């Protein structure tokens, strides 16, 4: 059985949906971002990046949404989550998933996590206002 570490309202939702879609046997473990659990030693032992999603499998630990989605699709080929028989089409799916994670998702990160970039409370507020 796999274990998915996630936080609500995060990009981990895509991995959660994929696992449900294929009927995978997994346990979902909430990482409490409100209490900085992602920065605690227990979670950092699992994922030193301190991010979600993290998928613990019998083969090892995977992080990053595109990697997890590709792994799930390849582990459950009959679910048809991705065009596994066509390398180019599969790469197009990977490109789209990477764009969502590295561009679209990140473009909104400043609203909720301005402290990653600046320490000045006024600058954090300005980033939040810019995102509205």
Model-based region annotation:
Residues 1-126:
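GST-like domain detector, emphasizing the conserved glutathione-binding G-site
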Residues 126-132:
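Amphipathic alpha-helical packing segments from all-alpha helical-bundle domains
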């Amino acid at each position: 059985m796999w274990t998915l570490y996630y936080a609500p309202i995060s990009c981990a939702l895509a991995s959660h949906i994929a696992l449900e879609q294929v009927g995978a046997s997994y346990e979902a473990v909430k990482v409490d971002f409100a209490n900085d659990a992602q920065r605690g030693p227990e979670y950092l032992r699992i994922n030193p990046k301190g991010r979600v999603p993290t998928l613990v499998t019998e083969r090892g630990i995977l992080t990053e949404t595109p990697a997890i989605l590709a792994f799930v699709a390849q582990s459950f080929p009959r679910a048809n989550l991705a065009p596994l028989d066509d390398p180019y089409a599969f790469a197009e799916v990977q490109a789209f998933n990477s764009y969502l994670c590295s561009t679209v998702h990140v473009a909104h990160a400043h609203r909720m996590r301005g402290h990653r970039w600046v320490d000045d409370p006024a600058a954090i507020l300005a980033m939040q206002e810019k995102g509205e």
